[in-house]
Amino acid sequence: MGILLILLAILAFFLLWGVAVYNGLITSRNGYRNAFAQIDVQLQRRFDLIPNLVETVKGYMAHERETLEAVVAARSAAQSGLAAAKAHPGDPEAMAQLAAAQGQLNAGLGRLLAVAEAYPDLKASQNMMQLTEELASTENKVAFARQAFNDAVMAFNNKRDVFPSSLIAGTFDFAPAVQLAIPGDRAEMREAPKVQF
């Protein structure tokens, strides 16, 4: 009878341990999904600003139609990438699609703003100044949200990969999550601004 109680106690311990690890993995997965929702909010804000930016510069840059169309197309592709990533945050394919689309959009916006520099009246426009300020602020919020997401993904993956949690993760198919790295962002951050007199 005593051995049976000891075996039941050991079984109960491992069962409770398994439930605790499983719940921890679920909590961690929900954490990175919530962090992705914050990226979604900021990217939607960015997408909402782009049509206003395009409308503002359209009158000044009539012969730069190709640049404007590239930004609009990149915005559309980025929205599609966001929809795929929103459905499966942390999924390698969805994150790669979103990263590529955001990289394209960053490049298009960079070209648009570079071309806008050639139009002094446009640069001095109050509407353009306000839009570029809002866009820069939103870009900072996207970067912050992306960092929070990547931190949450790393915490989930660490929890998922360490022994003995990896036993529960493998049993219940907790796939590793993938961080979001947008092409071009890191290079721009490493490169110091050039000052010339």
Where are these regions (language model features)?
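A helix-centric hydrophobic-segment signal that preferentially recognizes long
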Residues: 1-197
